[in-house]
Amino acid sequence: MKSVATPQSELPHILIYGSVNSGKSTLFNLLVGQEYAVTSPIAGTTTDVLYKRIELPEVGPVVLGDTPGVGDTSPLGAQRMAATRVALRRADIILVLEESLDPQLVKDYPNAIFLPFKLPFSEEREALREQTIELIAKTLKGRKSYRQETLLGNLAKPGDLVLLVMPQDKAAPKGRLILPQVQTMRELLDKHCMVVAIQPEELGATLSKLRAMPDLVITDSSVFQKVEKQLPHEVPLTSFSVLMSAYKGDIHRLVAGAKVLSQLPPNAHILIAEACSHVPTNEDIGRVKLPKLLRKKLGDELVITHVNGDDFPTDLSGYQLVIHCGACMMNRNHLLTRQEEATRQQVPMTNYGIAIAQLLGILDRVVLP
């Protein structure tokens, strides 16, 4: 039976950064143990960000990235550097192949750890490989934010009965569950909880058949209101999106961002950001359900812009609020960096589940991990 690989969004990201012809691709190939990236003496050989999953001793799988070089003067140089900047957003460790470390780089990516390399490489290749891998492993093991984060925090303990409400509508992927549901179920099983998974239509019947009320209910944010109305007030309620907001980002800032919803003008400009790219359906939460709820509460003059994947604008000054998805397909540093960019530009940011709970007036009812 083929094992399922750990999602790339759960792995540490190590990025190689530096000027053109500084040896980035050479170091990349050295670390992956094969000629994976094209190398040449011609400046600007690397034209796109290149990723490769590798296994490090004592650390496990990580994602290593090679990037287009700084100082690319070709006609596409600016676009290549834009791709590099996007990649830097998700980096946990940045191997810098420069004579000196640019202070602005550190300021722009405060959540990353920078490891400068002296140029040119003087060590024997195998020795350099071993030293670099040892340095990366040591850095990751000592990194506070690299600790084993949990989705649930203290919301569930061994023996708890946890009810998962998971609508399988047109927006649900065919033949499988979405990643937050899978990760939540796995963590609950690891905690030795008893897990019951249902669709919203079966909630009432399920509650009536249980001998006791569940210790926790986790729902899809799109049916928050429907579930909340049927639950006794003493039963703790949260959503997969809320869990992801704490797992991937700074939940306290995301909750504070949602409070702004009650203060927005009717013609406010809101950015809705989705981490992954998928074809939306008429039941899509980001493209249909959330905008509909926003306009119901704030009015039809509301201006909503949607972005997907890496198309997150560097200039957020034209928006009064950013509403981000749960970021299940992004690593933690990527979402934290987006939060930092929004904070720097004084633009509040929240996420789908928290925003929906706020708009429905039940945010105080929702438990946070």
Regions from the language model: what does each represent?
Residues 1-6, 128-152, 173:
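Flexible nucleotide-interacting loop at or near the entrance of a catalytic core
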Residues 1-78, 82, 86-89:
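Conserved G1/Walker A P-loop phosphate-binding module
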Residues 41, 70-76, 100, 140-142, ...:
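Short, flexible loop segments at the rims of nucleotide/cofactor-binding pockets, characterized by
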Residues 156-369:
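P-loop NTP-binding site
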Residues 62-65, 95, 216, 320:
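Hydrophobic "anchor" residues on beta-strands that sit immediately upstream
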